[in-house]
């Protein structure tokens, strides 16, 4: 699904989630904390109960005809299409799945505009509505679908949390996503998976100061970013028009830490399924030094004890300069120089791509070899791609650019 197919301009969407939250994973890396997980690797599939509400404007798009129950079933069927797409990514990258609560129909509205509880404010009102209709203890994550041009998770890392005040910024049921055409990947991946990613503990990854609002330690993708927690297509300088359907290393790190050891680990054992699938291994290799203005290759390795088909994702792990809006340049001494890309079956990644190297180039628009001395930090994430209950592994390494050689 292409964002260009939406009826509103591309830049009408803004994620307003506040970033003033400190998760333990943000201050620890390379497994320096023995209780921290950087990966989806504990052989558990976690199921979270989703209370999914909607405004009448959203409901009217999908209600169709029939009885009240039939119309609500039609609306929830569209919600299920969105969540099937979202769950597919969450299960593969995070071993998380979400299911509708039994009483979800009581959160679905359609009919006269203004007949629902929302009147322009969606976060606090969503929490109030869900709690009043189904009860605080009956769900783990609450969200609202509407047709406004924005999204706001209402919190970061609050899923399954104990805070009962919807106005607190820590309530589990205050997420919302709105688009005039709430269908397809432009809605499901770019926006719903993004906002729910915040609710589970993920921060923004885009580094452009035009839309920078992350943790200060997670803005590791140039420009708008291109993975789920970025702003692809809606923030200059744009890497591409739409988000790719995966979470980057920093988001897997933070969300995994939260659901295994943080607030979002607070679910009963009956919602955690143990499985036999073992995590893969990842080896990013040793740190090394290269001359300035020199193309290079990242060579990794991985294996899977169960023989699953593994994929590899090399990503730069350098938070960006707060003052930068442009694509990376060769003289940039801090921040990301290389964009994130979807995983491949090759353990190696050429920087920039081999096709460019063969022409003598050392850069593309979003992949630039530095001409100054600096460090480039990289992560290698290995996925085993099991349909439900996928596991990941990661390893970190550093390339030091010698500013006097080359």
Regions found by a protein language model. Name each.
Residues 295, 309, 373-377:
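Extracellular Ig-like/FN3 beta-sandwich strand-entry sites
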Residues 290, 300-306, 318, 384:
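Extracellular acidic, Ser/Thr/Pro-rich low-complexity tracts
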Residues 276-283, 310, 380, 405-406:
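Proline-centered linker/hinge motifs at extracellular inter-domain junctions
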Residues 284, 288-298:
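Short, solvent-exposed loop/linker segments at the N-terminal edge
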Residues 99, 311-372:
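Exoplasmic/lumenal beta-rich domain surfaces
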Residues 101-123, 164-245, 319-324:
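The catalytic-center signature of Zn2+-dependent metalloproteases
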Residues 383-390:
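Short, solvent-exposed loop/turn segments at the edges of extracellular beta-sandwich modules
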Residues 2-157:
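Fold-level signature of zinc-dependent metallopeptidase catalytic domains
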